[in-house]
């Protein structure tokens, strides 16, 4: 990669802003190098790499997809470096003014009407982490039938911004970029 003229980066959709900003700065300092970012759900990108798509760098939001690529011998364990951290947050449309007050007797399922939106709980990293959190808190089962799974955090954010879901679980960095939640 050090001598490449083009560097193709596959990155989780949740990293769109960060990778775009970093790429611009890098290209300004290294005018002979072009960064070509490709953003999608980590699962989609990992499947593309497994099928033979070429990428110089892969930023996954989920270690499971990295491990899948190791098993398929598409990357080596020594190539993995944890670089970024994020956290899940609960969002709602700004006009909704939900005020969730956490306490020992808090009933999340009754705290809002309608749907909760997050990434697909079996494949999208944010959805997998949301499922773990909701399960740990004992909130998953009471919400069954009210959870909408999306293909990425950005899709979840869009659903909540439009009011199609009353609440959503996304990464903090994605929530902070929106003026509508």
Per-region residue spans from a language model:
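Exported/periplasmic ABC-transporter solute-binding proteins
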Residues: 2-30, 34-53, 60-63, 67-73, ...
């Amino acid at each position: 990669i050090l001598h490449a003229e083009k560097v193709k980066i596959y990155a989780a959709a949740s990293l769109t802003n960060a990778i775009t900003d970093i790429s611009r700065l890098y290209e300004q300092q290294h005018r002979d190098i072009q960064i070509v970012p490709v953003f999608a759900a980590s699962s989609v990108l990992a499947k593309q790499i497994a099928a033979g798509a070429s990428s110089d760098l892969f930023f996954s939001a989920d270690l499971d997809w990295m491990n899948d690529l190791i098993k398929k011998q598409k990357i080596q364990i020594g190539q993995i470096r944890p670089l970024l951290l994020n956290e899940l947050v609960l969002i709602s449309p700004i006009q909704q003014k939900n005020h969730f007050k956490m306490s020992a007797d808090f009933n999340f399922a009754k705290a809002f009407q309608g749907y909760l939106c997050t990434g697909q709980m079996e494949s999208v990293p944010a959805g997998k982490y949301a499922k773990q959190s909701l399960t740990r808190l004992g909130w998953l089962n009471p919400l069954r039938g009210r959870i909408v799974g999306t293909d990425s955090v950005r899709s979840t954010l869009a659903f909540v911004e439009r009011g199609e879901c009353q609440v959503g679980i996304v990464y903090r960095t994605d929530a902070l970029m929106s003026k509508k939640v």
